[in-house]
Amino acid sequence: MNIAVVGLSHKTAPVEIREKLSIPEPQTESAIAQLTSYPHIDEVAILSTCNRLEIYIVAGETDHGIREVTQFLSEHSKLPVHSLRQHLFVLLHEDAVMHIMRVAAGLDSLVLGEGQILAQVKNTHKLGQQYNGIKTILNRLFKQALTAGKRVRTETSIGTGAVSISSAAVELAQIKAENLAACRVTILGAGKMSRLLVQHLVSKGATQISIVNRSRERAQELAKQFSEHPIRTHLLPEMMTVIAESHLVFTSTSATEPILDRAKLEMVLAPNQPLMLFDISVPRNVHTDVNELVNVQAFNVDDLKAVVAQNYESRRKMAQEAERLLEEEIEAFDIWWRSLETVSTISSLRSKIETIREQELEKALSRLGSEFGDKHQEVIEALTRGIVNKILHDPMVQLRAQQDVEARRRCMQTLQMLFNLDVGEQFS
C-alpha cells in the first residue's frame, strides 16, 4: 500500500480552474463514495478550500489509483484529462506525508502561516471518517498532521499576527478605497470568512457595514459578535438594493454559481456609479463580465497575491523553525508506518506457529489418554504457549526495530520464504 495525493492549488492553477474542481461539503459524501468504488483505491480524503483541491488516497497499485483519481477529477470538472494534467500535482508516500504536514501548518498557504487551514484539515478528517473514506492509514496520517499543525501554532511564532485571506482582502480594499471609514460596505454571506471580514474591517475603521445572508438568524448572530458596531443585516431578496447603495462589496458565500453579474448590476447601478467587488469565494460569486461596466472593479482571491507578498519575507524566516518541528512529526509517522509494514508478516508467522502448536498438542493429549487430567492439560497448554512466545519474541522485536527499509523488507521476505507464509497484499 502507498499514500498518494493528487491535487491542484493557487500555485498550479488559476481561480477559474480551481472553481471547476471545487467539491463543496454537501458533495463530499458522494465524491468519497465514487472514489472508493474504484478498484484500486482503499482509502480517500478530500481537502477542498478556496485555494486548493487535494485528494489523498491509499492504493495498492499507486499508478492505477492516481489514474482513477485523475479520471474522477476530469468527470467532476468536465475538463478533459489532457487539459487538467497541466494543473495537477502528484506526490507519493514520503512527499505526500510531508505535504499534508506543511498544509496543516499553513506553510503551503497563499497567506503563509494562516490558521484557518488547520480547521479545514480537521474537517476533512472528520468527513472522511463519517463517510467511510478514511481508515487506518489516513486516520493516522491526518491525526499526525493535525498534531503538527497545532504544534506549529503554539510552539512557533509564525501564527503571531498572521494574516488570512479575509484580512488580505480588507488590506487590498483599503489600498484601493483609501478611506474605509467613509465607505458603505456590504458583505454577502455570514460564515467564518465573513466573520473575519467584519473583524478586519472594523479594525481598519469601517463604520458602515451591512451583512446580506439567506438566513437572517445567521446574519444577526454574526452582527451580535460585534455589538459595539452598528452592523445592519438583510435577507438575500434585498441584496441588489443594498449593493446599489454600497461602495465596497465582499462576497463569501457557498454558492456554486455566480450570484452577481453584469446584468444584475446594470439594473441597480446608476450610470458610471463606482463599485468595487472583492470576491474571496471559490467557486467565484462574481462573474467576470462585471468588469465590462464602467467604474466597476472586481477582484478575486488570485488578486490578493501582491498584498500577501508584502509580508512574505519576514514570515518565511518564521517558517524555517516550523519546518524543523514538522520533521519530528514526519518521523513519528514514519516509525508507525514502518511498524505497520511488518504486521501482516508477524501476524501470519504467529498464526502458522499457533496452528502447529495446537495440532501437535492435540496429538500429544490424545496419546496420553483420558486419564490425563484437565489440570495437567492446562499446564502443558501454558508450557507450549510459553515456548512459542519465547521463540517468536526476539525475531518480532528485531523486525519492528529495523530502521533500514530495504533491510527490513529483506528480513520479511526471508521469513515468508522460510516459513512458506501467505501474507496477502504487502505494504510497499
Swiss-Prot record:
The protein's assembly and partners: Homodimer.
Function: Catalyzes the NADPH-dependent reduction of glutamyl-tRNA(Glu) to glutamate 1-semialdehyde (GSA).
Leading EC class: oxidoreductase
Entry similarity comment: Belongs to the glutamyl-tRNA reductase family.
Active site residues per record: C50
Catalytic activities: (S)-4-amino-5-oxopentanoate + tRNA(Glu) + NADP(+) = L-glutamyl-tRNA(Glu) + NADPH + H(+)
Name under which the protein is recorded: Glutamyl-tRNA reductase
Listed PANTHER family: GLUTAMYL-TRNA REDUCTASE 1, CHLOROPLASTIC
Important for activity, annotated site positions: H99
EC number of the protein: 1.2.1.70
Record keywords, A-Z: Chlorophyll biosynthesis, NADP, Oxidoreductase, Porphyrin biosynthesis
Species of the source: Nostoc sp. (strain PCC 7120 / SAG 25.82 / UTEX 2576)
Pathway named in the protein's UniProt entry: Porphyrin-containing compound metabolism; protoporphyrin-IX biosynthesis; 5-aminolevulinate from L-glutamyl-tRNA(Glu): step 1/2; Porphyrin-containing compound metabolism; chlorophyll biosynthesis
PROSITE patterns, A to Z: GLUTR
Chain positions recorded as substrate binding sites: T49, C50, N51, R52, S109, E114, G115, Q116, Q120
Additional free-text comment from the UniProt record: During catalysis, the active site Cys acts as a nucleophile attacking the alpha-carbonyl group of tRNA-bound glutamate with the formation of a thioester intermediate between enzyme and glutamate, and the concomitant release of tRNA(Glu). The thioester intermediate is finally reduced by direct hydride transfer from NADPH, to form the product GSA.
